[in-house]
Amino acid sequence: MREEIFGPVVTVYVYEDASFDETLELIDESTEYALTGSIFARDRKALIHATDRLRNAAGNVYYNEKCTGAVVGQQPFGGARASGTNDKAGSVSIFWRFVSARSIKENFVGLEDFSYPSNLV
């Protein structure tokens, strides 16, 4: 697929076992879009290998689940690459997109000990 299409589209690619890594490379490099993806496999090692190899290939990845399987309000959701900024709507991490955090610490007791490390009591 070369375009991002929002609609009921499914792509099924059947590959030979010997072509697994080549297929993962095709998935990872064939499009600039990366909203969601699903991996169906009975072999847990294959799932882990695919996840490691496709780390940046989709904002959300589903194992043995349809790629529209996000649980709204319970599972962070957001696309990567040209499909978004990979901010996860529904997660506290989306908050950091709109703020610049600054930490402030104030001592109300008075500073008497200047030794280091200062975190020891």
Feature roles, as predicted:
Residues 1-121:
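Conserved C-terminal structural/oligomerization subdomain of aldehyde/semialdehyde dehydrogenase
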